[in-house]
Amino acid sequence: LLHLDLVFMRVSAGQSAASFGKIEPGRAENVALIAMKAVLLARGLGSRMKQEGDAVLSPGQARAASAGAKGMMPIGESSTPLGAGGPRPFLDYVLDALADGGCTSVCFVVAPDHAAIRDYYRGDGRPSRLDIDFAVQPVADGTARAVQSARRYAGRDPFLVLNSDNLYPAPVVAQLAALTGPGLPAYEAELLVRESGFPRDRVTGFAAMDIDERGRLVRIIEKPGPDYFDKAGAHALVSMNVWRFDERIFDACRDVPLSPRGEYELPQAVGVALAQGVVFQTFRASGAVLDLSRRSDVALVNTRLAGVVPRP
């Protein structure tokens, strides 16, 4: 791995995607940046985003929502096209945070017909700080299969995996990249709700995690439900589906069984990897994670990112 001779900091003027919301100092900062690959899972059908609701959206946002195109959701109100001095797609903010966190290249996992993402990031939206690649997941059969789709891109290098509809603080990205092996951040459920601003009941749909006294992942529980979190309390640890992997995850993604929900799911593949002897390190993370999975999320994301200028 190439260790860049600097400490994580924002060096350009103005507010960036790395500085949205509140980021607790001293938790994931002062981390030497590491050149890292990242895989963005953008193949989802966007079923929840497509559902009609009473959220007030601009015409461009309404079109993106109807198409389930969460990552291409225009942030901010404007009549100008994306990237032409007007609104920026949500993915620009995600890419900006990845670049600030030390990533040097990104692979989008997309559907065969996802031309909008390819056209934008190969054209006017091409990042200046990141190399862009694409991998096609032919069928929307789960996040484990999505990761498998990026095997050629990852090669034998370590890489990050994250959702395209979540915006993670750049210091968390930097600390994740700086781990010495596979791992993930651990968020306290109550703190995550308070800092991120999404509805409290949403956290019950996230994956819960158990760790040992050395901070190693023991097990991950996909969508355990309200009863689990009621018993675990405010300090229950959850995964926000952002990971550092090495090439061993591909065998686990291949071997993972079909879930009761009819998909090959990445958290279950991590369970397979654990059973195969892979050690996953964890670290306690804080700071807002913005979630753009529903129409009702758009207003909060707009507010949190007001004045932010992404520079991917």
Model-derived regions, located:
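Conserved N-terminal catalytic core of the sugar/cofactor nucleotidyltransferase
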Residues: 33-67, 74-161, 261
